[in-house]
Regions:
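Weak global preference for isoleucine
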Residues: 38, 46, 89-91, 131
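Radical SAM enzyme [4Fe-4S]-AdoMet core and its adjacent flexible, acidic
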Residues: 1-84
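A generic secondary-structure signal marking the coil-to-beta-strand transition
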Residues: 4-6, 87, 136-138
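C-terminal accessory regions of radical SAM enzymes
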Residues: 72-104
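Flexible mid-to-C-terminal extensions adjoining Fe-S/redox cofactors in radical SAM and related proteins
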Residues: 97-153
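Aromatic-residue detector
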Residues: 24-28, 53-55, 91-94, 98, ...
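Short, solvent-exposed loop/turn segments at secondary-structure junctions
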Residues: 11-15, 49-51, 90, 96, ...
Length: 153
C-alpha cells in the first residue's frame, strides 16, 4: 500500500559509529529493491549508546573505554541544538519524568535532581531547565548525531 510508510532503522553492529545516513539509505534502497523487491520510505541511522546491555557487552569485550573515547573524540557541536533532551521529556509508566529514554534506563531523573512526576510539573517551568548528563550523552552528539529520527546534523 503506497499510503503506508516503512522506515528502516540502522544500528551499528559493534563499537563504531554509523556511516552517513544518506549513503546507507541509498545502498539499502538499491540492494533491498534489487534482491527482494522491497521499497521503503526512509532509513534512520542511530548510534549505539553505551548503556545497559550494550555497555555490558563492551565491558565484557574490553571495549567500553575505547568506545566511550570514540564518542568523545567525535563530538559534534552542530548536533547540540537538535538534541531530543533539549525539546522533549520522557515519562515512565508511573509518571516519573526524565530528560530522555536513556536517562530513564539509567534512572537519572529530570535535571539530575530528585524524582519528579508529570502531574507535579509546570510545562512553562521546563523551558531552559537543567538536563541530567553523563558520559553516555556523547552518543547523541558524536559524528552526525543521533535521535529517534536518525541523524541530527
Amino acid at each position: 500500500n503506497p499510503e503506508l510508510s516503512l522506515d528502516l532503522v540502522y544500528n551499528p553492529g559493534g563499537a563504531f559509529l554509523p556511516p552517513p545516513q544518506a549513503s546507507l539509505e541509498q545502498d539499502y534502497r538499491e540492494m533491498l529493491g534489487r534482491e527482494f523487491g522491497i521499497t521503503f520510505s526512509s532509513l534512520l541511522a542511530i548510534t549505539n549508546l553505551p548503556v545497559n546491555r550494550f555497555a555490558h557487552s563492551l565491558r565484557r569485550d574490553g571495549q567500553l573505554e575505547d568506545y566511550q573515547q570514540l564518542l568523545v573524540d567525535n563530538f559534534n557541536a552542530g548536533t547540540v541544538s537538535a538534541l531530543m533532551c533539549r525539546h522533549l521529556i520522557n515519562i515512565d509508566w508511573e509518571g516519573r519524568v526524565y530528560d530522555c529514554d536513556f536517562n530513564q534506563m539509567l534512572e537519572l531523573p529530570l535535571g539530575g535532581g530528585k524524582n519528579r512526576h508529570l502531574w507535579d510539573l509546570n510545562p512553562q517551568g521546563l523551558e531552559g531547565k537543567d538536563i541530567a548528563t553523563e558520559r553516555h550523552c556523547f552518543g547523541c552528539t558524536a559524528g552526525a548525531g543521533s535521535s529517534c529520527s536518525g541523524e541530527l546534523a
